[in-house]
Amino acid sequence: MITVAFVCLGNICRSPMAEAIMRQKLLDRNINDIKVTSRGTGQWNLGEPPHEGTQAILSEHDIPFDGMISELFESNDDFDYIIAMDQSNVDNIKQINPNIKGQLFKLLEFSDMTETDVPDPYYTNNFEGVYKMVQSSCDNLINFIIKDANLREE
C-alpha cells in the first residue's frame, strides 16, 4: 500500500480538502493501492473537523469528508509521499523530521499553474480558488505516483 499525506498548517483547510479530493479521484479511477491522509504542522486545531469553508466547497462538489479531524504531522510519521501546501510547511516538515524517508513535494509541483504555493483560505477566504488549485493538481499527482511506484489502474 502506497501512503500519501497532504500537509498544511492547521489541517483544517487545505490539506483535508486535498485529502478528500484525492480520495474521490482515486475512487473514481478505481485505484485501491494508495492510502491518503492529511496532517498539520501546527497544534492549534487538533481534533477539529475541517473548516466550514472547506466543508462547504467539498459539499458543493459532492465530495465526502465524513469523519475527518485535524491531526499533527509528527517526527515518527512514515509516508511514501508527503505533499505540502506551501514552502513554509516544507520547512516545518523538515524541521519536525530532518531524516524524512518519504518523497517530499509541494502540491503545485503537479500543476500547470505559475504559483508555487497554495494560499491559505483561512486567511484569504478563497476556498473556491484553493479548490480549483487542488483539483487541477491531484490528477497529475496520481499519474506521477502510479508511474513512480509502478502501480496499475484497474
UniProtKB/Swiss-Prot annotation:
SUPFAM superfamilies: Phosphotyrosine protein phosphatases I (SSF52788)
This protein's record includes keyword Hydrolase: yes
SMART domains hit by this protein: LMWPc (SM00226)
Domain of life: Bacteria
CDD domains per the UniProt record, alphabetical: LMWPTP
InterPro entries assigned: LMW_PTPase, Ptyr_pPase, Ptyr_pPase_sf, Tyr_phospatase_low_mol_wt
Reactions catalysed according to its record: O-phospho-L-tyrosyl-[protein] + H2O = L-tyrosyl-[protein] + phosphate
Catalytic residues as annotated in Swiss-Prot or TrEMBL: C8, R14, D120
Keyword list, A-Z: Hydrolase, Protein phosphatase
Enzyme nomenclature, EC number: 3.1.3.48
Functional description taken from the UniProt entry: Dephosphorylates the phosphotyrosine-containing proteins.
Family named by the database record: Belongs to the low molecular weight phosphotyrosine protein phosphatase family.
Database matches in PANTHER family: LOW MOLECULAR WEIGHT PHOSPHOTYROSINE PROTEIN PHOSPHATASE (PTHR11717:SF7), LOW MOLECULAR WEIGHT PROTEIN TYROSINE PHOSPHATASE (PTHR11717)
The protein's name: Low molecular weight protein-tyrosine-phosphatase PtpA
